[in-house]
Amino acid sequence: MRYDYLIVGSGLFGATFAYRAKQAGKTCLVIDKRPHLGGNVYCEKTEGINVHKYGAHIFHTNNKEVWDFVNSLVPFNRYTNSPVANYHGELYNLPFNMNTFAQLWGVRTPDEAKAKIEEQRADVAAMLGGSEPRNLEEQALLLVGRDIYEKLIKEYTEKQWGRDCKDLPAFIIKRLPVRFVFDNNYFNDAFQGIPIGGYNVLIDKLLEGIDTRTNCDFFNLHYDPFIISTLSAASPLASFKQAAFALADKLVYTGPIDEYFDFRLGRLDWRTVTFKTRIEDTPNYQGNAVINYTSHDVPYTRVIEHKHFESFGQSVYDNPKTVISEEYSTEFQPGMEPYYPVNDDRNNSLADQYRALAAAEPNVHFGGRLAEYKYYDMDKVIERALNMEI
């Protein structure tokens, strides 16, 4: 069978595009090199709990069209992201708000909190003498002062990036939201939640009635026995591209853009994360879905307790066990999963060169975080796929 589209990657971009293409009467084959569908939003069921295998994914958006779209497929729960920071055993609410300031300084009013922050910011401004911040440390100090920076930003950021804050560019932190209200809701968006039953339910709905194949590496497509038999190729296929366009008229690619071009201009840099996940014999390990560990003495950046994404109140205790994941940030090495683009001057310039190559590829659409070398929240990925021409 020849398809209208071969879609490489079954994450939110690929799955949403496939859904729209099917609605438009197009035929699609979605392939994924992993043994499952869903990309990084895939959930693994453990002890009756949907475990976010590739890290916490909390859906939030101000885009009502996107919110209505996902809710037309699956209902979402009322989960609200309210992380907590642990600094040497001291607990602070996030994002930075009046609860945080009360915990830091014992202040009770917005005016007291503003005065404390302005006092510390003024000290930094005087130190800089009117010059622009030269690095992330100076930028953060100028934005929020020394106490917040040293307890809640400095060491956490250094663990995330693997570098001293003095060696990180200032543009990484353009602004730091500070709220002078008692509100622990991390996001300002109008809509927020988790699909009831987990993200697999959403992916299954998006890909319903669409041909899919897992454990299928796009770059080895021309060697895949199933693909070869599907094509009934009389002679060996010369390349993955030849196989792709033997299968379909058009290609949607959601993998790393540099890999598509065989790294001919050089490799783009990424940050990645790894997880150590375990079952705990307690119904409630930490009392919150996400706790950030903001000091160097703890090697991981945060602990995720997956149960709290979907269980509330007494239902937390209905299951006597829980599942937690320690998240570790690390430098990307070939063979690891790329997570976050490193948007410094070198990588931005290189990405632009790859985008120019991509624009010249006939009948190939590049979309999503990896293929565009951009950090996207989930709603933006879906919005992009909804607006792409079929």
PLM feature spans:
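N-terminal Rossmann-like FAD-binding beta1-loop-alpha1 element of flavoenzymes
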Residues: Y3-V30, E389
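Short loop/edge segments at beta-strand edges and connector loops
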Residues: G9, T80, T214-D217, H222-Y223, ...
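Short, solvent-exposed loop/turn segments at secondary-structure junctions
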Residues: L12-F13, P35-H36, N99, E158, ...
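Glycine-rich FAD pyrophosphate-binding loop
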Residues: K22-E47
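Mid-domain catalytic core of redox enzymes
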Residues: A24, D224, T230-L357
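Dinucleotide-binding Rossmann-like beta1-alpha1 core, especially the glycine-rich loop
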Residues: E47-D123
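Active-site/ligand-binding neighborhood in enzyme catalytic cores
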Residues: E90-Y92, N99-P236, F240-L247
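C-terminal catalytic lobe of FAD-dependent flavoproteins
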Residues: E337-I390
